[in-house]
Regions:
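Short, well-ordered loop/turn sites that connect or cap secondary structure elements
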Residues: 76-79, 163, 246
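Mid-domain Rossmann-like dinucleotide-binding core that forms the NAD(H)/NADP(H) cofactor-binding site
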Residues: 140-219
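Glycine-rich cofactor phosphate-binding loops and adjacent beta1-alpha1 units
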Residues: 161, 204-276
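C-terminal hydrophobic helical "lid"/dimerization subdomain
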Residues: 285-350
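Glycine-rich beta-strand-centered segment in the early N-terminal region that forms part
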Residues: 20-34, 48-97, 137-139
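N-terminal glycine-rich cofactor-binding segment
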Residues: 3-21, 38-67, 84-87, 107-119
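Short glycine-centered segments of the SAM/dcSAM-binding site in methyltransferase folds
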Residues: 84, 168, 250-251, 277
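NAD(P)H dinucleotide-binding glycine-rich loop of Rossmann-like/cofactor-binding domains
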Residues: 93-172
Length: 350
């Protein structure tokens, strides 16, 4: 079978790999779709701590169960051949203080599928433990459902935010994560949601998913301060613009991933005087099952967010397009033989 392989830092190839064989309590999944995100570029560029090469990328994955290992059809996580599924890519040691105190996402032995040591889903078929595999309803679009993994990250982002009913929320970045955080805001009790992006084309997507207040600069908005400000860009310029816009007693969240060696300037005195909270959020923590439930009950509008699908052979093209900030969510569909533009193409969703 065919797979994308990050052979070493900066080296990408498409290669033949052996067919996967499931171990105990594992299944083989035929990949339907796998989303491309910034983590994939960080991994290829050697910027993600602990990555072991060669590695098959791909951690935002859905597919169909095609084979069962011993015991995979037993217990509360039992699966069957033919099930459509979404896959939680995270695994942890389960033994360290962080794991034992409920902070598994911060485990120093965290192993993200397609990120650290375990091969990901940018291949025609892959294995996963049943504990990480979540069954989808038969009527759930298995391609759009590849947004469930980033949705699980967004739900955890809201979990760690101190908030009140009727807060006013400002989100920087109208990419995938910004759009998900903004769409969840009303369900988290927000009275209003404002989204900022320097790219007007991305604000068109924000309008399509229902975000009313959209600007290329926060200075153009109809408010000067917000209770909650969330940066989904990792841009130092956005962070430095956003922190002063937090209302007294409010909270600023670092959701986007800034470069590891980057620093931002802010006023410690203002944080002290106005009791501004600054919080981070990392990956998924007990939120994947909730993401499945929220996706399947229509919490987000997925269709406008996915613009292109690519074959395995066009993975490098997809990465170039992602780095250039073109399109919306880009997907690789390893078992399709044509790369396609999905938006504005009736009948082309699959």
């Amino acid at each position: 079978m065919r797979a994308v392989v990050f052979a070493a830092v900066g080296e990408l190839t498409v290669a033949e790999r052996p067919e996967p064989v499931p171990g105990p309590r594992e299944v083989v999944i035929e990949t339907a779709a796998v989303g491309i995100c910034g983590t994939d570029t960080h991994v290829l560029d050697g910027e993600f701590e602990g990555t072991v090469f060669p590695l098959v990328p791909g951690h935002e994955a859905t597919g169909t169960v095609v084979a069962l290992g011993p015991g995979a059809d037993e217990g509360p996580s039992a699966l069957a051949v033919g099930d459509h599924v979404a896959v939680n890519p995270s695994s942890t040691c389960g033994e360290c203080d962080l794991c034992l105190t409920g902070r598994q996402n911060l485990c120093r032995a965290w192993n993200g599928m397609g990120v650290v040591r375990a091969d990901g889903a940018a291949q025609q078929r892959f294995t996963a433990p049943v504990a990480n595999v979540f069954k989808l309803r038969p009527d759930t679009d298995v391609f759009e459902a590849a947004l469930i993994e980033p949705l699980a990250c967004a739900i955890h982002g809201w979990d760690v935010l101190p908030r009140r009913m009727a807060d006013h929320v400002l989100v920087y970045g109208s990419g995938t994560m910004g759009l998900l955080m903004a769409q969840l805001a009303p369900r988290a009790g927000a009275a209003s949601v404002t989204i900022i992006d320097v790219n007007p084309d991305r604000l068109v997507t924000a309008a399509q998913v229902g975000i009313e207040h959209r600007y290329t600069s926060a200075g153009d908005a109809d408010r000067a301060e917000w209770d909650v400000v969330i940066d989904c860009t990792g841009s130092i310029a956005a962070i430095e613009d956003g922190l002063p816009r937090v209302m007294a007693g409010g909270v600023f969240q670092h959701f986007g991933v800034a470069p590891a060696d980057a620093t931002a300037r802010y006023s410690p005195f203002r944080v002290y005087r106005d009791e501004v909270s600054v919080v981070g959020t990392m990956a998924v923590l007990n939120s994947f099952g909730r993401a499945v439930a929220m996706f399947e009950t229509g919490a987000i509008k997925a269709q406008p967010m996915i613009s292109h699908s690519f074959t395995l052979e066009d993975y490098a093209q997809a990465l170039r397009m992602f780095r250039a900030g073109q399109g919306r969510k880009l997907q690789v569909r390893p078992n399709q033989d044509t790369s396609r533009t999905l938006l504005g193409q009736p009948g082309q969703r699959r």
